[in-house]
C-alpha cells in the first residue's frame, strides 16, 4: 500500500549505524525506529482506512471468475437492468463498506453514486430499483460494466 501510493518517501536511516561483525543482525532500537515510522503512517486516518478497505476486502481464496464472452457493453447492461434483470454477486466475493468508501476484492470503487455503491455492498442481487438513478449516470454504468466484465457480478442466463 505504501509503495503503491509513494507514501514511503521517508525511509529509515541511521547515520550512526556501525559496521557489524554479523551484517544480518538488526538491533532492537532499529526495529523500534521502524515500528514508530509505521505507527506514524497508521495514525493518518485517510491512509489507514484506505489500506484497511483494500486489505480486508481481498479474497482469501481464488475466486471462480467467469468473465462474460464477449464482454458486455454499458448499453447492454443498461437495457438488461431496464428490462428487470438483476445482477448476482459472485459467491465468495468480498464487497465491503469502510466509512463512506466501498471496496470490491481489494479495490476502491470510485463513484459519487454512494447509494448505488451501498446497494452493491449490502445485496447479493441488485436490480435497477436498488441502483436507483445511478443506472442513468454514464460513469457509474461504466464502473458497473467493468465489474460485470471482471466476473464479479453476472446476469442469470
Regions from the PLM with identified roles:
Residues 1-157:
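Fe(II)/2-oxoglutarate
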